[in-house]
C-alpha cells in the first residue's frame, strides 16, 4: 500500500486520527473497527468534499494491511462510495494485487465501477479478459467496465431512472423507466436469464429492489420473492449481490431465503457472509439473532467475522441507536449508516 495510506499523517483532524487508530488496530474488537470504518465513510462521502475528505479516505485505505478479509472488503466498498478520484489509486492497487483475498479484490473492482472514472478501464478490461483470474474477479470487472461505460455515455443522459430510497452507488443502475413499466414477472425473467449480460441482469435486480421499498409497498413481497430466486443462480457473485440487496431492504420476507443461504455449508463464503450481514440488518425480527448465534463457530473465518458484525448490527437495530458508527467524544454526532 502506498506510504501515504499507512504512514501516520501530521496535522490531521483529531477525530479522524482517533477513528483511524481504532480501524487499523488488530487488537480492537472487529465490530468496533467496523463502527470506526462507517464513521470514516460518512466523513469521506460528504458532498461537497471538505478538508477532512482526503484524510478520511487515507485512513480507510490504511486498513488494507489488516488480516481480516471481511474488513478489507468493506474498506473497498466504502472507498467506492466516496465519488472521489482520490480513492481510485488505492482500489487499483488492491484489485491488481493477486495476493489479496478474492473477496477484497472483487470489492475493489466493484468500487472502481461505482466511482465511474474511465481511467480505471484498462486495468478492469485486462482482468476481465484474463482467463487465469477467478470467475468472481472476471465477472465483477465485466460489470464494472459496463457501469463505467454507461456512466460516461450519452445513453445515461437520456435515461429516466425511478427515484430510489437508497443513496448507495450500485454496481448497476436500475433499468430505466419506460412508458409502460415492466411487471415484476418481466423483471424476474431478466434477472434470472443467464444468457443476458450480468450488467443487464443487475439492472433488473436493482429495479426489483426499488419495488420492494418501503416494505409496505404493494409490490414489496412479490419483488422480494422474485429476488430470492436469484440466490439459486450459478454465479456466486450474483448470489452475493442478491443477499446484499436484501440487507439494504431489511424486509422480513427475505429472512427464510437468507437463513437457508447462511445455513448451506457448501455455499461460498462470500455469499454466506453477505447473508449473515443481511440478517444482522433484520435483527429486530424474531428468531434472527438466535439463527446468527448458531454460526459463531463456523469453520469459515469470513462467516465467523460476519456473524460478529451481524450480531452487533442486530443489537443496534433492537436498541434503536441513532447511527451504526463509532463517534469519538470530540466529534459532533452524525447520522451514519452501515453499507
Curated annotation (Swiss-Prot):
The keyword Metal-binding applies. Its cofactor is Fe(2+). Disulfide bonds: none annotated. Its main location: cytoplasm. This is Deoxyhypusine hydroxylase. One of its GO terms (cellular component) is nucleus. Fe cation 1 binds at residues 73-74, 106-107. Pathway: Protein modification; eIF5A hypusination. Catalyzes the hydroxylation of the N(6)-(4-aminobutyl)-L-lysine intermediate to form hypusine, an essential post-translational modification only found in mature eIF-5A factor. The lineage of its organism: Eukaryota, Fungi, Dikarya, Ascomycota, Pezizomycotina.
Amino acid at each position: 500500500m502506498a506510504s501515504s495510506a499507512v504512514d501516520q499523517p501530521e496535522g490531521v483532524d483529531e477525530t479522524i486520527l482517533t477513528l483511524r487508530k481504532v480501524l487499523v488496530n488488530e487488537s480492537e474488537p472487529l465490530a468496533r473497527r467496523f463502527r470506526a470504518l462507517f464513521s470514516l465513510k460518512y466523513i469521506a462521502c460528504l458532498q461537497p468534499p471538505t478538508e477532512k475528505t482526503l484524510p478520511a479516505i487515507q485512513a480507510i485505505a490504511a486498513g488494507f494491511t489488516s488480516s481480516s478479509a471481511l474488513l478489507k472488503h468493506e474498506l473497498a466498498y466504502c472507498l467506492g462510495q466516496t465519488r472521489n478520484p482520490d480513492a481510485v489509486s488505492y482500489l487499483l492497487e488492491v484489485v491488481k494485487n493477486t495476493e489479496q483475498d478474492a473477496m477484497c479484490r472483487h470489492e475493489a473492482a466493484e468500487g472502481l465501477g461505482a466511482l465511474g472514472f474511465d481511467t480505471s478501464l484498462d486495468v478492469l478490461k485486462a482482468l476481465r479478459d484474463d482467463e487465469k483470474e477467478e470467475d468472481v474477479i472476471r465477472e465483477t470487472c465485466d460489470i464494472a467496465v459496463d457501469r463505467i461505460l454507461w456512466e460516461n455515455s450519452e445513453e445515461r443522459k437520456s435515461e429516466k431512472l425511478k427515484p430510489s430510497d437508497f443513496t448507495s452507488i450500485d454496481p448497476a443502475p436500475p433499468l430505466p423507466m419506460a412508458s409502460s413499466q415492466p411487471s415484476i414477472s418481466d423483471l424476474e425473467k431478466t434477472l434470472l436469464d443467464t444468457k443476458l449480460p450480468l450488467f443487464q441482469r443487475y439492472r433488473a435486480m436493482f429495479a426489483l429492489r426499488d419495488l420492494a421499498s418501503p416494505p409496505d409497498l404493494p409490490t414489496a413481497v412479490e419483488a422480494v420473492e422474485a429476488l430470492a430466486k436469484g440466490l439459486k443462480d450459478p454465479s456466486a457473485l450474483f448470489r452475493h449481490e442478491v443477499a446484499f440487496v436484501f440487507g439494504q431492504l431489511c424486509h422480513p420476507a427475505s429472512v427464510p431465503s437468507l437463513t437457508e443461504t447462511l445455513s448451506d455449508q457448501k455455499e461460498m463464503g462470500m455469499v454466506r457472509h453477505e447473508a449473515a450481514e443481511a440478517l444482522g440488518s433484520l435483527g429486530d425480527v424474531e428468531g434472527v439473532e438466535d439463527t446468527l448465534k448458531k454460526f459463531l463457530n463456523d469453520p469459515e473465518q469470513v462467516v465467523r467475522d460476519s456473524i460478529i458484525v451481524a450480531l452487533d448490527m442486530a443489537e443496534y437495530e433492537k436498541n434503536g441507536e441513532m447511527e451504526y458508527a463509532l463517534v469519538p467524544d470530540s466529534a459532533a454526532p452524525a447520522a451514519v449508516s452501515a453499507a
